[in-house]
């Protein structure tokens, strides 16, 4: 599914997205392709299916749970930032804490979040024990 088809699907599921959120979701693919070429955090076969295998599945959480403004959500073992990054776009007034033990993954998460202008994401390398 190309990003344009994905945008049609996401707008069907979430029709009230702001222009900024639409732009962030559209930019997500290019940022992950760029960073995945430098630091392999998503399987090379999965990067072509980023929206269907990672983004849409992450957003499925929003169909059963709505995060309230001012709430804090922790994504333990975030890997490349899923489900945290897509949910942070969808819920800009909710704070998301993404943690993973692998430093290169957290670097990508921080770079993608910065590239999208997400101010509600904090990612750190740590163990969750």
Question: What does each model-found stretch correspond to?
Answer:
Residues 1-69, 74, 111-121:
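Class I SAM-dependent transferase core
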Residues 59-129:
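Conserved SAM/SAH cofactor-binding pocket of Class I
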